[in-house]
């Protein structure tokens, strides 16, 4: 907890 939400990780090619 206490962490900002991270952006979605795109799938690797």
From Swiss-Prot:
Domain of life: Eukaryota
Tissues in which the protein is found: Expressed by the venom gland.
Record keywords, A-Z: Hypotensive agent, Metalloenzyme inhibitor, Metalloprotease inhibitor, Protease inhibitor, Pyrrolidone carboxylic acid, Secreted, Toxin
One GO biological process term: regulation of blood pressure
Keyword Secreted included in the entry's annotation: yes
Predominant cellular place of this UniProt entry's protein: secreted
Residues with Pyrrolidone carboxylic acid modification: 1
Sample GO molecular function, one term: peptidase inhibitor activity
Statement: the UniProt record of this protein carries the keyword Plastid: no
Compartments (UniProt record): Secreted
GO cellular component: extracellular region
Job of this protein: This peptide both inhibits the activity of the angiotensin-converting enzyme (ACE) and enhances the action of bradykinin by inhibiting the peptidases that inactivate it. It acts as an indirect hypotensive agent.
Family: Belongs to the bradykinin-potentiating peptide family.
Name of the protein: Bradykinin-potentiating peptide 13c
Species in which this protein is naturally found: Bothrops jararaca (Jararaca)
Classification lineage: Eukaryota, Metazoa, Chordata, Craniata, Vertebrata
